UniProtKB/Swiss-Prot annotation:
This gene lies upstream of and overlaps yoaE on the same strand in another reading frame. May serve a regulatory role in expression of downstream gene yoaE; in a yoaL-yoaE-lacZ fusion mutation of the start codon to a stop codon in yoaL decreases expression of beta-galactosidase, suggesting translation of the 2 genes is coupled. Induction: Expressed approximately equally in exponential and stationary phases (at protein level). InterPro entries: YoaL-like. Pfam families: YoaL. It comes from Escherichia coli (strain K12). This is Protein YoaL.
């Protein structure tokens, strides 16, 4: 019973934490590939113009 009560009291904090982590992860998931693609296409276009 005591363990159940403790688990119940920690659950809202857990949900909040997972929500924050999920939001942060989603932000990274969107931003990181965008930056990677931008730098990649930039270096690719540079190497292409350098080659031709």
């Amino acid at each position: 019973m005591d363990r159940h009560r403790r688990h119940f009291s920690i659950r809202p904090f857990n949900a909040c934490l997972s929500g924050t982590l999920c939001r942060t992860f989603r932000l990274h998931f969107v931003v990181t590939p965008a930056l990677f693609l931008a730098s990649n296409s930039y270096s690719l276009s540079r190497s292409l113009s350098w080659n031709s």
